[in-house]
Amino acid sequence: MRYMKYSIIIPVYNCKEYLCECVNSILTQNADCDFEILLVDDGSSDGSGELCDSLSKENDSVKSFHKINGGAASARNYGIEKSTGEYLMFIDGDDTLSQGALEQFAETINDSLCDMIVYGMSFDYYHKGTITHQELLSCQINGVKEKSKIFGSFKRYFEDNTLSSACNKVFRSAIIKENQIRFVEGMTLYEDFNFVLNYLAYSEKIFFIDQPYYHYRIDVDHQHLHNRVSNLEKLQSNLELLLSSMLDLSSQTESDEMLSVGADLYISLLDLNLLYSNESIENKRESILAYCNSNVFAEILERGAQPHPRYKELFSRISSGQINDLQKEYRKRRLKMNARKKIKRIIQKVRK
C-alpha cells in the first residue's frame, strides 16, 4: 500500500470534558499510515488549552496550537496553514471517529486515487451524559462517482445530507492549498457546505463509503435551533455567501438542481425564522422584504432554480403583502408546536 499521511485538524473551544475521548479515538486507530493531530485551541477558558498541551507532550503525533478566539472557521484555517499531511480531515473536539476508519480510508485512496472521500455519520443524542438514541446517516451509494454525476443528481446527494458537513470527509491537501480554499470566517451557518462546494469545484473523483465512521455528539439539553435562525439579517448574509458559491459552481457544472436546492434552503430558513423568532412578523416587515428581494436570490431564480411548491407559495405570499395573514398562521403553528413539546415532557416524566 502506498504510504500516506493524514493531518487531522481539531478546533478546540471549551470542550475539555470530551477532548480526550476525541483524541484517543484517533490515536487508537489500527492503520498502516502516518498522521498528525493538530489541536487548535481557539481561546478556551475551561482548561481545554492546557489539556491540548498535555496531550501533545504525551504523544508525538499530537501538536498543540493556541490562538485568539475567532470561531471554528478561523481555527480550522489556522490548522490548514500548519498542516503537513497529504490528506486533511476535520473533527470537532467533542466528536469521535470509529475504529477502522483510517485503515478504510487508506485502502480507498490507494485503490481509487480519488480526490475526496465521503463517509457516513452517526448523530449521537445525549441527555445528561447518556446516549438516548442514534440517528445513522449513511451514504445511499457506495463507490466512486465522477463530479458530473453528482451535480447531475445534486438534490439526491443533498437530501442524503452527506455533502453539507466537512467532518465526514477526507480531502487532498494540495487541492485545498493550491486553490486557496478556506472556511469563511464569520459565517456561522452552512460554512461547511460552502467549503465543500468550493472544494468540489477543483475535484473530479469522489468516493462514497456507506459506513458511519464519524460520531457527531448532540446534547439535547443545549440544542436551540431558534438561536441560529432568529437574526434574519445574519441569516441572509450567510446564505448569500452560500448561494454565491453555488452560482459560481453552476457555471462549471450547469447544475439547475443545485440552484433549486439553494433556493429551497434560502426560503426554508426564512420559514424557520418566522416560526421560531420571538419578534412579531409585523415588526420585522422591512427585514423580511429585504430578505426576499436579495439580488443573489433573484439571480438564483433567473438562472433556472425551481423552489419546492410550499416554499414558492410562502415567497409569493410575502411578495404580495400578506404579512398579517402569515403572522396569524405562524402564531397557530407555534402554539401547536409548544403544546406537542409539553405533552412529550409529561409523557417522559410519567415513564420515569
Task: Go through each PLM region and give its residues.
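Glycine-rich, basic loop-to-helix element that forms the pyrophosphate-binding segment
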Residues: 67-83
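Short beta-strand/loop segment that forms part of the nucleotide-sugar
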Residues: 34-43, 63-68, 92-93
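A conserved acidic beta->alpha catalytic loop
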Residues: 25, 41-51
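Membrane-interface aromatic/basic loop that binds lipid-linked glycans or pyrophosphate carriers
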Residues: 276-352
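Donor-binding/catalytic cores of nucleotide-activated saccharide
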Residues: 93-209, 214-233, 249
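Short, well-formed alpha-helical segments that are part of the catalytic scaffolds
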Residues: 14-28
